[in-house]
Amino acid sequence: KQENIQKSSSSVFYSLCKNIKNTEYISSSKIPCNFLVLHSIMYKEISYQSAEEALSIIKSGDRVYVHGSAMTPNFLLAELAKQAPRLQNVELTFISVLGDIVVDRPEYENNFHINCLFVSDSVRHAVNEGRADFVPVFLSDIPDLFKNGQLPLDVALIQVSPPDKHGYCSLGISVDIARAAVSTAKHIIAQVNPNVPRTHGDSMIHTNRIHSFVYSAHALHVVDYSAKVGKEELQIGKFIAELIDDGSTLQTGIGTIPDAVLKSLNNHKNLGIHTEMCSDGIIDLFEKDIINNSKKIIHPYKTVTGFAVGTKKLYDYVDDNPAFAFLDIDFVNDPHIISKNPKVVAINSAIEVDITGQVCADSIGSKLFSGIGGQMDFIRGAALSQGGKPIIALTSRTKKGEPRIVPFLKQGAGVVTTRGHVHYIVTEF
């Protein structure tokens, strides 16, 4: 059907769609760019509820998705904690959340069950104390858990921008798995925040898809990775910069080392970005036209990302910026999609690496620290890319002076990237 529609003229397609009401045609990142997608949705003014009223729909035994990263709806979560006395065994599932989510506190253990798909600082203690669960899963596979019914969602708690004149809100700087969550959840509660950037790509959701609206003008979470960059990270950044050719497509993971790499690329040309996460380090390279995405095959001239975490400067920069495409993570992190771009350089960090090349990136011994995330998605995608380079980067020692390149991984350590997938290991030496 897609093939037939693509062959038809826009006028014919419009005549087919113009009378359809209350139907939303969501463009998929995997549909070719020349595929015509029209929207014909009745828009009505939204009405706001109190958080207490909106959350009253949640009942015991429900599974609730929580929007993540800088878009964490902390205002809604704080109110949900107040409703704990009427609730039992409500499962909350998410990837990385920021700030105090309240519901993970010990006193709510019987009311709320945390099921993390990635372990962030906000829930690390709860996971390691056994009060919360962790599912080790590739980031690219998470949307299918929602879509295939393995993790059916009763409710989604999201944070969005106010609607535009056509009734569209934006999922802001965290589209990642949120796109799949809002597509499958039975009931959607939106925290509407004027501070949320309106981003391009797969971020739009129409108000007709949202069941409850709660207004909150809280500032978004910020993280300044550049402030944490030390001399060892800067040296690693310089070494990695030597491995990056002009015209490469970059994936930069989470942490200080990716930011240090970006600081070392001022003499490069025609770089592209296809990454699950972007931070402030890309802004200067954009303004110098070092990053222009001109050599990419997939979404040329656009920076492709799943989410952004950084300072307000970054959030203002991506706001209504058509040079950025915030897309569904099952597209962004698909190794086969990644590999279609030329010279993909995937830069990811590790906690510990043994001398055979096994990479522990999610735990310190048996203590869970983060998660699987998208490391393997991009390590594999870069390896399949023509001229690609999968890179694991870490300082040679911890802040306590303990070695991180070791004969054997600590007992209980998790292997995120196998020795068979490792191509480059970079330290400050």
List each language-model region with its residue ranges.
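N-terminal non-cleavable signal-anchor helices
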Residues: 6, 13-14, 38
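Compositionally biased low-complexity segments enriched in histidine and/or tyrosine
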Residues: 3-4, 19
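Compositionally biased low-complexity segments, especially N-terminal hydrophobic helices
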Residues: 9-10, 32
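Conserved alpha/beta enzyme-core scaffold
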Residues: 35, 40-429
